[in-house]
From Swiss-Prot:
Belongs to the comF family. The keyword DNA damage does not apply. Disulfide bonds: none annotated. The keyword S-adenosyl-L-methionine does not apply. The chain crosses the membrane at residues 97-117, 128-148. Residues 1-20 form the signal peptide. Its main location: membrane. This is G8 domain-containing protein DDB_G0286897. Keywords: Glycoprotein, Membrane, Signal, Transmembrane, Transmembrane helix.
């Protein structure tokens, strides 16, 4: 125990002595003849280019030893040419202090040990001896601390120099350690690590030597990218080990190599004598290379591949494919879909069993606990392959019993099932309880036999099955049934191997159902079929005034700049880069192109690794008439930073083009860049057929988009590689995993992702770039032309202005475009227009994008052309925006969500609608096309005095969107809504994804006569939630095809939908997952909606629907509210129905709300409600209440739960009866059952009650030119205000209200906005006189007050008309005020109570 205590004290003493790394000091290098003599110390030397300094310097840090001050171990010569490490006996004051501290610590520690020993040891004599020995040791240490032993010292030396700094001479004399020297430039260099016979590893890169290079080491010597002056340079390398030397651009001179193993690249003529190799390289010169290597010598890149003659050009790349396509194969091989532990889950009625690895490859094991159920399921977590009816498929597995066959191990049979996903427990959910509905499976088959009996060998069992109908979206399950009721008292197991479904091989023949057009109704615009004309004589790289990058004379320094330096092109020169000009592996730190300079790339395959390129002048890598055919890779390097390393405000890791600069990067044109299937592609297919001519190539990557609704949670987009291509037929290297629809209704898009010119971030899915989501970026503040580029892993997540391709604050440009490019796997957006106008984005594609893709940033961007582009698989950043009903969800700007609208990331994000969008397609995303509301510009344009949301669409024609809108209940594939604001106080953006309305005007200027409609022309929507979701005041949708969407559109304000096909169910077998489809839902208040010339088709009854609104109906009522009540706001005309049963035409849900009671619309030509006697005449449809049964033409439809009547001379009328303290104006949100009376029809021969309830929420809607009897259960109010909201010109309401006898009245009409329409009612002689009058008289028959409600302020032009149908305006603030008084009857709290509910005469 005592020894353990001593040990603890020794450990304590050790840790008090050990020191950490310590900076000793810095030394400025002012002499270009510089040497370091470190022959007596261990050194770790790093040569670093540092452009933050102007004068070279040494930074010396102690790693080990006693030194704490640079002067203790270093002397510097007076001329500062030599730094020498030495062993000095006189210490600096600081080291003396350290010595004193050490002594003090040692005394304290030894005294503690002595004290400890004397108090814990019974042998006092031995304790005293211990203490004496300690003091002797202390005395020796005190004597020794007067000097430092440099053999125990290790230092780190950083030699920091500015880029392109050149030494006259540079010498290192080294002891043990290591040196990493990159970017050293000198006339002569000498590195000696041999003299001290110590091991010092040496790595050298990017070395430039003009006169002499000498390197000697006892370890390996490795030098990469060595540049020697072409004449009079001597290089001597010596080691007892190995030498690996690589020249940057060859070597010209004599060589002498002494080594038992020599490897030389081509370029030299040599002779060998013993182990000595001598000769000349590249014609020889006065330069000499001498190598002595004890083991081996390797010399690379000896040949001079880059001549410096200005007329020399590398051979340009060919425009032809790198590989000629083989023929499309005639027989497609069979395809297996394998199942195993990773994609199956055990499910049963009880017990939770995990699948474990099996005994052999491709096998898994199931161990049943005691008394498990006799039946269980193996359910696939992946969608099943789609299966064609009538095709023979094979299911097979190999099974091994874990125990001998017995009572509890016997398997009676196995069944395969295909279930509708909604009918069973979700295999990807948390529950393992297998439950399915009473609906039959899509398909099942049982098989049994003797192959389930072996516990010694796997025995294969297979069955052939042939579905009787096509199976689309399905879950595959395998049911295993045992003979015994339970598994018994002991655990048992089985193993399954090679479980799979096999799709048989088939012959490849041209299908008979190839499409000749992509739409039935619409003509979607397509780009020109012509390729851009090319003229090879115009190629910039052929021009004669170019100078070569690799020619030392190009550079003022006389040498080719090193990759690790900040490279600035010489002013006024046009510099040509060829593949041999640059290192293909080293990372170039920064290249700057001054305003008068140009950097031109050759049209030849090359790779340039770079951190930053700053273009103040011009960068040319192809032009519009000379598009490059070479495979050129530009790889951007760098870890995440917010420091501006390119230039101020321009970020890091990319290309920035300054104002006044110009960039042109234009690769081979592939056309079309995207197309569509011309027939459906099935699971297992290798071959697809497309609609358009294409010039794609073998080896390129192709995307086929999803044909399902939710592409984010069920990603069925597939990236394939072309194996063969002939015309419009493409064969892939592997079979398709999913089904991709290509019917007449719509077709999956097929997009080319590959390009010959590639910009990419340096990550590969595993490196730091990917984990930091920090790729490269291209920013253009001047003019820029880009075509034929693929950008991979570009963009920098949540860093503003760091996007793959980005026009940044360039104003109105004259000649800028991005054409036929591809952005894939982007960390932040795809194509951005920011503070820039007149840009063209044409024929581009994008796939797998984080945040908004095509992105117009601040709300000031106008007059841009966005034509024929494609975007797919776009991901919201963070939590996707959801929220209840119309309110949406609010997101605040944060470090993890710099642009809060990225919570609703769309394929196209348009902050100012005054741009041209033609022929684009959007697959996936929160929405396909997003038009957020901005009351002010944001970002750099907050002071611009416009209202972006007031600008109408400049052009929106022929665009397509699908597989989107599902994150939010009210989300749409085209979403005009949401609100983005900037808070001046917090300096943060806020985004609300919900309902925000916009009103649009000419030039964005609000004034009378400037009103403009948001117009969507020839639009196709499919697999969508709301299709077009428009929250605004004015919208026209003309030309629409909607297929397999929950609802084709939700349109607010004055809205017209015309010339459309609305298809509830297409032929896509993976789209029908039991979702409710609605043709159109009429809104419940204050809008004007007209539907005209629409074909509704394939709305099929759902026997399991909960109510009519969820039963695949064509027209749906909105019935959720008593606060919001419809006026006469909806109309239809020229409606046709195809494959729609009569029961499915209208879906009206009967609930006790005003919106349910007052549901109505006008069918202006009886086309939607056929079977009327007055064929072609207008028909009025009203809700379930007989309040709408106004004449003998009315009939009740039991399927629709609505009254249908000939309209005749009637119109929809609406008033608000306002009573102080009972029914107030506005949205008072009273309860739905807050009944205060009834409104009943009277007159016109009506004698029975045809009524509707009045609640405390204002508003009654019914039929005009009828008698409306208003009765209040609380008693008749003494004061009533009737707002005549919608009684159109030449129409009226004959209103009756009961009062006690002898009541007197003061009745007046007032129009808030023009008092010339104000008047007082006068007493008439009869009720009929009132009804037949002009609306200025009243009559009281001692039971009922009669007035005629008309609106004399109307001109007759108060309506919205489109497509031959009208919807009349709501007219604001035209009111009739009734004041009643009675000398005989006193009101109670303003009400005359106890008044009988007596219906006026039916003869009135």
């Amino acid at each position: 125990m005592n020894y353990f205590k001593y040990f603890i004290f020794v450990v304590f003493l050790f840790f008090t002595i050990v020191k950490c790394e310590q900076l000793l000091g810095e030394i400025e290098i002012s002499n270009k003849n510089f040497a370091i003599d470190a022959s007596v110390v261990d050194t770790k030397i790093n040569y670093i280019l540092d452009d933050t300094i102007k004068t070279p310097k040494l930074i010396i840090t102690s790693i080990k030893g006693d030194a704490t001050n640079i002067n203790d171990i270093i002397t510097v010569s007076e001329d500062k040419s030599t730094v020498t490490f030495g062993d000095f006996t006189e210490l600096s004051s600081s080291n003396k202090l350290v010595g004193f501290n050490w002594i003090s610590m040692l005394i304290a520690s030894l005294l503690s040990i002595g004290l400890f020993a004397t108090t814990t040891t019974t042998n006092k004599k031995s304790s005293i001896i211990i203490l004496i020995i300690g003091f002797i040791c202390l005395s020796l240490m005190i004597n020794g601390i007067q000097s430092i032993s440099l053999s125990d010292v290790s230092v780190k030396i950083e030699i920091r120099v500015p880029s392109n700094y050149q030494f006259e001479s540079f010498k290192l004399k080294l002891n043990s350690g290591s040196s990493n020297i990159v970017g050293l430039i000198a006339n002569s260099i000498e590195i000696d690590s041999c003299s001290m016979v110590k091991d010092h590893s040496i790595t050298i890169g990017q070395l430039v030597v003009f006169s002499s290079l000498k390197v000697c080491s006892s370890l390996d010597i490795k030098i990469t990218n060595l540049g020697l002056s072409p004449s009079n340079t001597i290089a001597e390398l010596k080691t007892t080990r190995n030498i690996d030397l690589q020249f940057s651009n060859g070597f010209s001179g004599s060589i002498s190599i002494d080594s038992p193993s020599v490897t030389l690249d081509p370029g030299c003529t040599t002779t060998i004598s013993g182990q000595t190799t001598t000769g000349t390289c590249n014609g020889g010169s006065s330069s000499k290379l001498s190598i002595s290597a004890g083991n081996s010598a390797i010399v690379r890149n000896l040949e001079i591949t880059c001549p410096i003659d200005n007329s020399w050009r590398v051979t340009p790349a060919s425009s032809g494919p790198s590989t000629n396509s083989p023929s499309i194969f005639t027989t497609q091989p069979a395809t297996n879909f394998n199942y195993g532990k990773s994609n199956l889950v055990f499910m049963a009625q009880w017990n939770n069993v995990s699948l474990l690895d099996g005994p052999v490859e491709n096998s898994f094991n199931i161990t049943y606990v005691t008394w498990s159920p006799n039946s269980h399921w193996l359910v696939s977590k992946d969608p099943s392959p789609t299966l064609k009816s009538g095709v023979n498929y094979e299911f097979s597995l190999e099974l091994l019993l874990g125990q001998p066959l017995g009572e509890y191990t016997s398997i009676s049979n196995v069944s395969i099932y295909f279930f509708n996903p909604k009918d069973i427990t979700n295999p990807n959910g948390n529950s393992r309880y297998f439950q399915y509905s009473n609906k039959p499976p899509l398909y099942m088959k049982t098989f049994s036999g003797a192959n389930f009996i072996s516990n010694s060998n796997f025995i294969k069992t297979s069955i052939t099955f042939s579905p009787t109908k096509d199976i689309g979206s399905a879950v595959f399950a395998l049911q295993i049934n045992r003979t015994a009721a339970l598994t018994g008292p002991s655990e048992i197991s089985i193993s399954i191997k090679d479980m799979k479904i096999t799709i048989p091989s088939k012959s490849i023949t041209t299908p008979s159902n190839i499409l000749s057009k992509d739409s039935e109704l619409l003509t979607l615009p397509r780009p020109s079929t012509l390729l851009d004309p090319q003229d090879s004589s115009s190629c910039t790289y052929k021009q004669t005034d170019l100078v070569h990058w690799h020619n030392p004379s190009t550079w003022a320094s006389g040498f080719v700049p090193l990759p690790s330096s900040n490279i600035i092109l010489p002013e006024g020169k046009r510099v040509l880069i060829s593949p041999c000009s640059i290192s293909q592996t080293e990372v170039y730190k920064k290249i700057t192109i001054p305003p008068t300079s140009e950097l031109v790339f050759s049209d030849s395959p090359m790779t340039i690794n770079v951190q930053d390129i700053y273009v103040q002048g011009k960068l040319t890598m192809g032009t519009n008439t000379c598009r490059y055919n070479a495979n050129i890779n530009v790889i951007f390097h760098g870890n995440k930073t917010t420091t501006d390393t390119i230039a101020q405000y321009f970020g890091s890791k990319g290309i920035a083009v300054a104002s006044g600069g110009f960039i042109s990067v234009q690769g081979k044109q592939y056309h079309n860049t995207w197309t569509k299937l011309s027939t459906t592609a099935w699971t297992g297919d290798y071959v697809i057929y497309v609609q358009d001519s294409i010039n794609w190539e073998v080896g390129q990557q192709v995307l086929i988009t999803t044909s399902v609704y939710r592409d984010e949670s069920d990603n069925q987009n597939e990236v394939m590689t072309i194996a063969a291509i002939q015309g419009k037929v493409i064969q892939f290297t592997k079979p398709l995993r999913y089904y991709h629809y290509g019917g007449q209704e719509y077709q999956a898009e097929v997009a080319l992702l590959s390009r010959r010119i590639v910009f990419r971030g340096d990550g590969n899915g595993q490196e730091q770039t990917d984990s930091q989501s920090f790729g490269g970026h291209v920013l253009v503040n001047g003019e820029g032309q880009f075509s034929g580029i693929q950008l991979i892993r570009m963009g920098q997540t949540n860093i503003k202005a760091r996007y793959p391709l980005h026009y940044h604050l360039a104003g109105t440009v004259k000649n800028s475009y991005i054409s036929d490019c591809s952005v894939t796997n982007s960390y932040y957006r795809c194509y951005t227009i920011h503070g820039t106008n007149n840009v063209s984005l044409v024929r581009n594609v994008a796939f797998d994008i984080r945040g908004h893709c095509y992105y117009l940033e601040d709300g000031v961007e106008v007059d841009n052309n966005i034509w024929f582009n494609f975007a797919s698989y776009v991901h919201p950043i963070g939590k996707p925006a959801g929220g209840p009903s119309q309110t949406g969800e609010i997101f605040q700007q944060s470090d993890s969500l710099t642009q809060p609208a990225d919570s609703a990331a769309g394929c196209y994000y348009i902050t100012n609608a005054y741009n041209s969008l033609v022929g684009n397609a959007a697959s996936g995303g929160w929405s396909g096309f997003a038009f957020p509301n901005l009351d002010k510009p944001i970002g750099n344009h907050r002071t611009i005095s416009i209202i972006p949301s007031q600008f109408p669409l400049k052009e929106f024609t022929g665009n397509t969107a699908h597989s989107s809108g599902y994150y939010f209940e009210e989300g749409g594939s085209i979403y005009v809504g949401g609100n983005l604001t900037f808070n001046e106080a917090t300096q943060l953006l806020t985004y609300n994804s919900g309902r925000f309305s916009r009103s649009t005007y000419f030039n964005g200027t609000k004034k009378d006569g400037n009103e403009r409609w948001m117009r969507f022309n020839n639009t196709k929507i499919y697999l969508s939630n709301r299709g077009i979701q428009h929250w605004g005041e004015r919208v026209e949708v003309v030309g629409l095809e909607s297929h397999d969407s929950i609802r084709p559109s939700t349109l607010f304000g004055q809205a017209w939908l015309s010339n459309a096909i609305v298809n509830g169910q297409s032929g896509n077998i993976v789209s029908n997952q039991g979702r409710n489809r609605q043709g159109f839902q009429f809104y419940d208040t204050y809008v004007q909606t007209i539907l005209s010339n629409i074909n509704f088709r394939n709305f099929i009854k759902d026997p399991d629907s909960e109510n009519p609104e969820s039963d695949n109906r064509v027209i749906i009522s909105m019935t959720h509210s008593d606060v919001f009540k419809p006026q006469g706001i909806s109309a239809t005309k020229q409606i046709t129905l195809t494959n729609v049963a009569s029961s499915q035409v209208i879906g009206h849900r009967v609930v006790e709300t005003g919106s349910s009671r007052y549901f109505n619309f006008i069918d202006w030509d009886t086309s939607l409600v056929p079977g009327r006697t007055a064929v072609g005449a207008p028909t009025l449809v009203g809700s379930h209440q007989n309040w709408w049964q106004y004449d003998a033409t009315c009939s009740y439809n039991n399927d629709w739960l609505c009254w249908v009547c000939d309209k005749g001379d009637k119109e929809i009328a609406s008033i608000s009866v306002l009573v102080p303290g009972l029914i107030e104006s506005g949205y008072t949100n009273q309860e739905e059952d807050s009944y205060v009376g009834t409104a009943s029809l009277f007159g016109n021969g009506i004698t029975n009650r045809r009524s509707t309830n009045i609640t405390r929420n204002a508003g009654i809607t019914g039929v005009s030119n009828m008698g409306w009897y208003l009765w209040f259960s609380t008693g008749t109010p003494t004061s009533i205000n009737i707002w005549v909201a919608q009684v159109i010109k030449n129409n009226y309401l004959f209103v009756a209200i009961p009062y006690p006898a002898n009541t007197e009245f003061s009745i007046r009409c007032a129009y808030r906005w023009n008092n010339k329409f104000n008047y007082n009612f006068v007493l008439a002689n009869s009720a009929s006189e009132v009804r037949n009058g002009n609306g200025t008289r009243y009559y009281f028959d001692q039971t009922h007050l009669f007035i005629k409600a008309v609106n004399l302020a109307l001109t007759g032009n108060e309506y919205f008309e489109r497509g031959g149908a009208k919807v009349y305006n709501v007219f604001w603030e035209f009111n009739i005020y009734i004041e009643a008084s009675n000398k005989n009857v006193q009101p109670v709290n303003g009400f005359y109570t106890g008044i009988p509910d007596t219906l006026p005469s039916g003869n009135l």
